[in-house]
Amino acid sequence: MFVTQILIVGVVACIIFDLWQRVFQKLTAIPPSNWAMVGRWSLGLVTNGQLIACDLESQAKRKNELAVGWLVHYSVAIGYAAAYAWLMRATVLQAELIDGLIFGVISVAVPYFFFLPCLGKGMLARLTPNPPLVCALALLMHSLFGASIGLGFAVFAD
């Protein structure tokens, strides 16, 4: 049953993340994440072994890149839920909002120092037109996502 809980919590937290990006776009005109670019990067990694992409936006579109991007997005979300579950089993985290929020804030290190550089954006988005905005948005989204995971596991608590 615990694997099912991880899957459900990861997917639901990711849905909340995606819905909030749509609401945020309506409020601010800032577009949501472009999962096609994640798919393009993923396909490049698989076919060419290229971990760090250069100028990803100008590269030719790849077949099914959007679908692959969404698949990677949801797979990573489930991975985060599994990490949270493991930390709960190790009694580092509890199934609650505050621990989820802390987890989300810490988890933003992954896009800051891994995904953004891999997508050709540089560490801390330094190669983007507005690095502070990109970093702030990542922190906002990962905070919401982490809180959603913490609350999600709280729903399953005995």
In which residue ranges do the predicted regions lie?
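Juxtamembrane/disordered regions of integral membrane proteins
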Residues: 1-158
